[in-house]
C-alpha cells in the first residue's frame, strides 16, 4: 500500500468515457523507467524463467516494457492494435511454441485468447473494472499437461480494490450498484501478491512466502468461480 507506484495510482483523478482510469493520465504517471524497472524486478524475483503475459497501459508503455525486459535478458515482444494481423499471429504462435518468453499486450488478450501453458500474468495496468481484472487473470487459468501453477503478479494493487480472484463477492449487490464493483481484499495481502493455481484437488491453501501472499486453489475450483460467481 505504501509503494511508490501505489501512491502514484492513488493520485489518479481523471476518468475515461467508460468510467475507468484515463489512459493518458495512467501513461503519464506510470510509463516511466523507475516503474518499469520495478515491473522487471518483480518478474525476476517471482517468475524468473517462466512464460507469461503482461498487461500494459498503452502502446508506448508496452513497447517500453518489452524493450527494457529484452535489454536485461528476457525474450519479450509487445503486441497491440497497430501490430499487423499476420505479424501478431506469428508472434503469438512463437509464444505458444516457447520461442518467446514474455508477451506484453494492450487490451489484446483480455478475452478470446487461449494459451494454456502461460505460467504467469503480470498486471501493469490499473483499472476500476472488475470484469477486466477477472478477464486478465483468467488468461493464465487454462489447464494443460505439465502445468503446475499460474502466478499472478499484481504490481498495480488491483487485489486491494477487487480482492483476489477467488474472493467471495455479492454479485447481486454489485449489479444493483450498492458495492460499485468492489471486492473484499484481505488485510494480510501485499502490494505485489501472487497466486498459484494448482491443477490438483487439494483444498484451498494460503501461505506467506518471502513476505508475499500465496493462495493455492484447485484449477477447476477457480475456473468454476470465474464462470459462475459461486463462492469457493
Predicted regions and their residues:
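Conserved interdomain linker/interface between the two RecA-like ATPase lobes of SF2 helicase motors
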Residues: 1-58, 170, 176-177
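Conserved nucleotide-binding/hydrolysis micro-motifs of P-loop NTPases
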Residues: 3-8, 59-60, 83-85, 109-111, ...
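Long, largely alpha-helical accessory region at the distal end of helicase-like NTP-driven motors
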Residues: 25-27, 31, 35-38, 44, ...
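Conserved helicase ATPase core of P-loop NTP-dependent helicases/translocases
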Residues: 53, 61-111
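Alpha-helical scaffold elements adjacent to nucleotide-binding pockets in ATP/GTP-utilizing enzyme cores
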Residues: 68, 91-94, 117, 132-139, ...
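Short glycine-/polar-rich loops that comprise or flank the Walker A/P-loop
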Residues: 72-75, 116-120, 146-151
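SF2 helicase motor core recognition
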Residues: 103-121, 137-142
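Conserved segment of the helicase C-terminal RecA-like domain
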Residues: 126-135, 139-170
